Amino acid sequence: MRLNASRKPQFRSQIVSPQLCDDIIAYIGPSLQKHKNCDILDINPGIGIWSSELHNFLQPRSHILLESQPEFYKPFLEELSNKPGSKYKLLIGDTGDFATYERLINEGQFPNQTRLNPGDPRLNQLNNTLLVTGSFAYDPVMPGLGFSSMARQVFSQFAKSAWSNELFHAYGHVRMLLWATTDDSQFLVPRSVTQPQKFPMLLQKICTTNVIASPISLPRVSGRQGASRDFRTELEGSAQVFAAMQRAGLEIPVHRRDALCTFAHKFFGKFAANSDLGVQGSLDALIEFERQGMSMQGLLPETVREQVALEEEIAKGIRKEFEIKPVTSTKKPKPILSVDGKRLARLRIQNRAAQKKREMRSALVDKAEEIYQMECFVLTTKSKAGKRETKAKLDVLNAEYKTEKNALNRLDQSLVDTEFDDRLAVRSPLHRLEWDKRSFEPLLIHDNEVWPNSRTALLDMTPKPRPEGESFRDVEYYQDILIPILANGSLTVPQALGSIAPGASQLIEEVPALRDPAKGGRLNMDHFRARMLRGEILDGLVKAYREWPFRPPETDHPKYFQAMSTGTLMLDRR
């Protein structure tokens, strides 16, 4: 059945490119092989193009099509389910109601699956005989309950259900390939330490999440909407990924490369893949690529791209930098700046000033990194003399750093902290963000491959085994305590702990990992911001707080801080 304007889908954007589906399947095909002949639960399949391409590759023994909007998509899906001998089965249900998934299991819609009993070790293992895929790419956004979007609510429940073995995870942990808007994708997998991290930290604890495909990056503009990593750090992270892809023999087709991937293939293919190009070097390299006709949208600031384009057009004679103003006197007319010339002059001034500020901040970030490395030495060296000498140098360097940083305005001070934290996130082997753990870059989705056109991404979520002795109630406590700790990620660790309860900063001494560089710790807690807390450190802080005798008794409820943040009064204590 053809998709036309009279049948324009409402709410959910549809994947309309078989070529995109084929490219995705070819890209992640090796990891899909273990799901051959599995059962598929396909949530909100829509017009079914992604569904049919995935089906053709996996040849599943059963394929449940669970559609929530049959008034739009039933004719498309019946073309699949009504074929003789079809393994498809079309079911109608509310995909935002989690009881729908429980009913599927209770009704025996997966006869090849076995619901496991409590205590069965397979509950904590990946079940490769079932694969979940689906789409919650609503545009405009469909709000969720307690979440800004339905996708975030559903993905949150899907992930947490893995460790409680609810929904389809009753058969063991299930891999999920889920479509969402890029806003939701980047909420779940942040690309900078400045982005909200409360739920992403929980998700990182429960699942490994990869971005398989995404659209072109938005233009890099100034202000809150343009908030992103410094392009120097972006390039350094991309170099690491490019090296990993080379080791794995993985290459993205040319037509699926975004600006970051294009740069990595063209530049790091010739130079050392772990290159830090520096502030000016990064800018010069990106400008050169832009001049060669390779769009660096999302990496180069838009004002720089505009300057490059204007200079190119003036050089080709398409525009004029100067014009001759007619005069009535006998004096020789002088050339004056044209409208384009004035714009170019303003852009050059603006971009030079911005680059000067970048260089100034970078020098301070270099000093902050030097301080961090010296702290790591103090914490790890066995030489008492070396420790004493380094501490003395640290005192001097810290004083210099504080003076120089305080000379900046508040915005630039904040940017120095952000750029240092992002640099550390990329360079640390711990990789504090899930995004920095990626071993491959996402494929590029073109505008005409999603209809109606919207910014859509594909996520690959695979549950991790739940640590022995950790209950799902422990996970709820963990999620709840993250709320005050990460409410303002730019606060220092002592400040963030103080927001949990008065005196809670003393918990620092109960968590040795906080001062273990191998686990993400450092010496000076006043330089350690809450957004950099990860892994064993967060686990240790949660454990220390729950065992702290001075904690307010009401915080024993696993949803206390959630209720406080939303203004909800709780009367029960489960």
PLM region spans:
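Catalytic cores of RNA-modifying enzymes
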Residues: 1-472
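C-terminal target-recognition/interaction regions appended to catalytic cores
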Residues: 2-3, 412-418, 427-434, 444-574
